[in-house]
């Protein structure tokens, strides 16, 4: 007995030392017992393949912890991997290899504790139970005991008072003025306007060489470690109705691809450049996280660009991975992802005790998002409209075997709030996935207290003068699609024109580029755009900076005054223009952004540059050309603001990236259509005349008489029938069409008109009224009758 006790004590001590677990207090040896399921709830599904799954869809485990018995209820994490999931490695020659494994089964689960309302779990069952679970505010780590054949596990209790537990910090990059401090009094009001639709974030993970070296044995150890982190992140973000899925990972197994230094801002800048110029060209994702295992002399545990989600250069973050506890690293990933979604650190008055909140400064795994974080996230959605997280990465055919309880409204269901023990929605019957009697809706901006709001109730307020308020229809729980004023609608008392729901001005752009109250500089500063260098140009073609023409000066590099530059964004340049006679000095400041393929230092497209003129790709052009329509650029009628007619509203997402190219393409398309219609029209007229001629010639007549166009009211003898459609002879883009018009004299100019005229008894001619001689296209009417007859 004593020998056995000493053995287990040695095992426990060696296990703790090997794992190096921090932020925990004590441990308890447990023997999880697998329980039979009391019900299947439609879990026996038909799979597309005949390959049986090794891991069950639903599990129950009994864990006796202290004096309590916990029943752990687990459901396999669905849509855990994106449909385009990939894994990338490098060989010893530094050659890159990417594979797309078709993983049909996995051992990662999420769930809760039965009979505990406030509980959650993120567990893998690959080799025993490993992961995180909580009951109320108390959090636990469970792991199998190494070298044990009897199913022993260790359960650690996270200690919020442990010294290390308050040592978590990250680099706090400045938020723009749009991410202002939250007014706590309006928190509930903002939550009432919550966006209920599920969001999707395709997460990609990059592991540096140090992480690889520590986790390369056994071969799949690092894969399972990354999967465990993402499973934890997904569990946390489900509380915001965000589904985080793993798009793939890349392992720098043959050396780091960037320089990783103690200054995390510099490391983030290097990583953002690499992922934009290299990774994005071979992989699609919404956000990428670099896990760095390099020992850096800094207490900072991570860094991210504030509000950077869906932005090519800024949707990335760096997280230090020096601890063996997957849950703590997953918590850091969730924290940095929160910054990318517009969330700031929790502080007064939104303090979050006991390390419970994701955006707090605790190191142990968090439980939830604070009210401030939720409000900041909702405000970010309204202001920035990040489109990438609205895209469901799973096609319909990928979402197999529907069942009641999967939190998706499948065919035949009215609602689905998840498993019975997890459902908290008062409107939905979780057993049958139907609405409870007397209720008409479950959720949505136009659903209140399980009843649809009346027609005309405002469900989305206009955010600015270029936006339009949306109202409920009375028959749908969802708010209608977000629409806004037509592009070109005057805004800010004539200072600008609306563009895609915003009113872009140079003053606002300056305040975003520079910190501390910058505004547009004097108009004389824009003369510097004639220089044709990186601090003054209108177009960037390769490595050549094209100087601005006179008319385009205010659409080149933007010049500001006041504020201070942000070294994080790029390099600034200041000019001092001095007027000796008036003894006046004008300061002109501009910025050249680092590693940015689309230079945001140029004046934004849609910014006013004259009456009826806007900037477009470094040029000042008329609004009709910029927006490719005189209709959409004209203001809406007073009574038509709220309807869906295209002349008054422009849909989101219809922005033309290259206006010039789109305009040329549209012009060619219009010319092709006009040519085809003219050719068809001329052919039909000729065919009709020939047919009528045949009919008249077949009639037996006693004496020749004048044939009048009785049936064809458009034809009269000795009168000209004139077509009003212009013929476009400039048809060089369509050589095959031009060949069919070889008989048309080259002297014809466009536009001109075709005149049909009676030339003789047996022939008809097509004549140009400007020509002295008719061009006759003689037709053999007799042979034509035989062919038609």
Curated annotation (Swiss-Prot):
Q: Residue ranges under compositional bias (Polar residues)?
A: 772-789
Localization, UniProt: Membrane
> How does the entry describe its membrane topology?
Single-pass type I membrane protein
Q: Name one GO cellular component term.
A: cell surface
Propeptide residue intervals: 24-176
Tissue specificity as recorded in UniProt: Expressed in both the head and tails of sperm (at protein level). Expressed in the epididymis (at protein level). Abundantly expressed in the apical region of the proximal caput epididymal epithelium, with decreasing expression in the mid and distal caput epididymal epithelium.
Per UniProt, residues of the Peptidase M12B domain are 199-393
Source organism superkingdom: Eukaryota
Segments crossing the lipid bilayer: 668-689
Q: Which residues are glycosylated?
A: 84, 167, 174, 583, 628, 664
The cysteines joined by S-S bonds are: 310-388, 350-372, 352-357, 459-479
Q: Where is this region: Disordered?
A: 764-789
**Any phenotype upon disruption?**
As a result of decreased egg fertilization male knockout mice produce a 15% reduced litter size whereas female knockout mice are unaffected. No difference in male gross organ morphology. Reduced epithelial cell heights in the caput regions of the epididymis, resulting in increased circumferences of the epididymal lumina. Infrequent histological abnormalities can be found in the caput epididymis, such as sperm granulomas and mineralization-like features. Increased frequency of intraepithelial vacuoles and hyperplasia found in the cauda epididymis.
State the conditions that upregulate or repress this gene.
Induced by testis factors and androgens including testosterone.
| Cytoplasmic side stretches | 690-789
Which named protein is this? Disintegrin and metalloproteinase domain-containing protein 7
This chain is encoded by the gene named Adam7
């Amino acid at each position: 007995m004593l020998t056995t006790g000493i053995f287990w004590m040695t095992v426990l001590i060696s296990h703790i030392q090997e794992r190096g677990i921090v932020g925990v207090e004590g441990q308890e040896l447990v023997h999880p017992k697998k329980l039979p399921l009391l019900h299947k709830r439609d879990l026996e599904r038909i799979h597309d393949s005949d390959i049986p799954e090794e891991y069950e869809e639903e599990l129950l485990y009994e864990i006796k912890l202290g004096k309590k018995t916990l029943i752990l209820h687990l459901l396999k994490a669905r849509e855990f991997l994106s449909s385009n999931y990939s894994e990338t490695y490098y060989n010893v020659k530094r050659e890159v290899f990417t594979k797309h494994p078709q993983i049909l089964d996995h051992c990662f689960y999420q769930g809760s504790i039965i009979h505990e309302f406030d509980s959650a779990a993120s567990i893998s069952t690959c080799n025993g139970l490993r992961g995180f679970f909580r009951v109320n505010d108390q959090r636990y780590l469970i792991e199998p005991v190494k070298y044990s054949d009897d199913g022993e596990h260790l359960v650690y209790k996270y200690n919020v008072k442990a010294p290390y537990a308050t040592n978590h910090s990250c680099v706090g990059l400045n938020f723009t003025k749009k991410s202002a401090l939250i007014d706590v009094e309006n928190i509930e009001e903002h939550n009432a306007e919550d966006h209920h639709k599920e969001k999707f974030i395709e997460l990609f993970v990059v592991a540096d060489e140090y992480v690889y070296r520590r986790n390369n044995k056994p071969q799949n150890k690092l894969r399972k470690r990354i999967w465990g982190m993402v499973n934890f992140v997904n569990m946390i973000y489900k509380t915001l109705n965000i589904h985080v899925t793993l798009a793939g990972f890349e392992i720098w197994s043959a050396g780091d691809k960037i320089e990783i230094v103690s200054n995390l801002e510099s490391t983030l800048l290097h990583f953002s450049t690499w992922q934009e110029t290299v990774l994005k060209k071979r992989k699609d994702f919404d956000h990428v996280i670099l896990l760095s295992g390099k020992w850096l002399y800094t207490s900072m545990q991570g860094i991210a660009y504030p509000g950077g989600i869906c932005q090519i250069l800024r949707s990335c973050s760096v997280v230090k991975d020096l601890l063996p506890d997957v849950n703590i690293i997953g918590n850091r990933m969730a924290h940095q992802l929160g910054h990318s979604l517009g969330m700031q650190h929790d502080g007064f008055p939104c303090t979050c005790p006991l390390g419970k909140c994701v955006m707090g400064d605790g190191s142990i795994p968090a439980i939830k998002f604070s009210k401030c974080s939720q409000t900041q996230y909702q405000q970010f959605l309204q202001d920035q409209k990040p489109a990438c997280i609205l895209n469901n990465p799973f096609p319909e055919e990928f979402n197999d075997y529907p069942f009641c309880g999967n939190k998706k409204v499948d065919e035949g269901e009215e609602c689905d709030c998840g498993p019975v023990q997890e459902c908290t929605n008062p409107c939905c019957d979780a057993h049958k996935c139907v609405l409870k009697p007397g209720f008409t809706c479950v959720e949505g901006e136009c659903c209140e207290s399980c009843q649809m709001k009346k027609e005309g109730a405002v469900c989305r307020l206009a955010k600015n003068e270029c936006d339009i308020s949306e109202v409920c229809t009375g028959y749908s729980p969802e708010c209608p699609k977000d629409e806004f004023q037509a592009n070109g609608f005057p805004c800010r008392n004539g200072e600008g024109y609306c563009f895609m729901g915003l009113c872009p001005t140079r003053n606002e752009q300056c305040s975003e580029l520079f910190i501390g109250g910058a505004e547009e500089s004097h108009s004389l500063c824009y003369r510097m755009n004639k220089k044709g260098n990186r601090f003054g140009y209108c177009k960037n073609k390769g490595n050549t900076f094209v100087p601005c023409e006179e008319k385009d000066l205010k659409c080149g590099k933007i010049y500001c005054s006041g504020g201070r530059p942000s070294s994080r964004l790029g390099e600034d340049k200041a000019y001092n223009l001095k007027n000796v006679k008036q003894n006046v000095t004008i300061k002109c400041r501009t910025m050249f952004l680092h590693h940015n393929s689309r230079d945001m230092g140029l004046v934004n497209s849609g910014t006013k540059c004259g009456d009826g003129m806007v900037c477009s790709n470094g040029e000042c052009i008329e609004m009709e050309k910029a927006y490719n329509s005189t209709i959409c650029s004209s203001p809406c009628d007073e009574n038509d603001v709220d309807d869906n007619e295209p002349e008054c509203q422009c849909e989101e997402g219809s922005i033309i990236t290259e206006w010039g190219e789109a305009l040329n393409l549209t012009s060619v398309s219009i010319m092709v259509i006009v040519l085809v219609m003219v050719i068809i029209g001329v052919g039909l007229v000729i065919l009709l005349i020939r047919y009528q001629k045949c009919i008249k010639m077949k009639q037996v007549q006693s004496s020749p008489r004048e044939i009048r166009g009785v049936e064809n009211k458009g034809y009269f003898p000795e009168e000209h029938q004139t077509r009003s459609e212009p013929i476009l002879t400039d048809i060089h883009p369509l050589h095959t069409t031009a060949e069919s018009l070889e008989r048309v004299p080259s002297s014809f100019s466009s536009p001109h008109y075709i005149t049909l005229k009676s030339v003789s008894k047996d022939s008809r001619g097509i004549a140009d009224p400007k020509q002295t001689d008719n061009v006759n296209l003689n037709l053999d009417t007799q042979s034509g009758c035989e062919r038609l007859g």
